[in-house]
């Protein structure tokens, strides 16, 4: 690592810490030549391959902007959108791949968005999955209803269990 002050090609790591919720490493470095300290931030690169075949760096802000449109008029805050984008990025990075197709990013958005707001989920899914008819919406809604019923039954079963004490 070159010193930004004297351009010496060596530097010594003084301190390392996790940054950005574990997706980056912040290192404090010191130049042995001039003695000055500087900070570097190391992240792994994550490239999104678009349909055209062009690659571009993953962007949380693009995820937020895309989901924000689906959330217009819904009780979803900017903090909710930021948390969703973070969850999407963590899911994608957990795959360990350096490159991911844009389609996979969209799939990674669907599950956390469904948990956040079902109406926004339907809006996003209708565009992302190219709904073409009312039947497509009806199918998606019936799946949401079925999942809600299953969750309600599971929650009811847990609350009716008696404590062994």
UniProtKB/Swiss-Prot annotation:
Cofactor names: Zn(2+)
BP-aspect Gene Ontology terms: negative regulation of DNA-templated transcription
Record's keyword terms, sorted: ATP-binding, DNA-binding, Metal-binding, Nucleotide-binding, Repressor, Transcription, Transcription regulation, Zinc, Zinc-finger
Zinc finger motifs (unnamed), residue ranges: 3-34
Superkingdom of this protein's organism: Bacteria
A Pfam entry, by short name: ATP-cone
Cofactor mode of binding and number, as noted: Binds 1 zinc ion.
Any GO molecular function: DNA binding
Function: Negatively regulates transcription of bacterial ribonucleotide reductase nrd genes and operons by binding to NrdR-boxes.
Family (UniProt): Belongs to the NrdR family.
Protein's recorded name: Transcriptional repressor NrdR
Source organism (scientific name): Arthrobacter sp. (strain FB24)
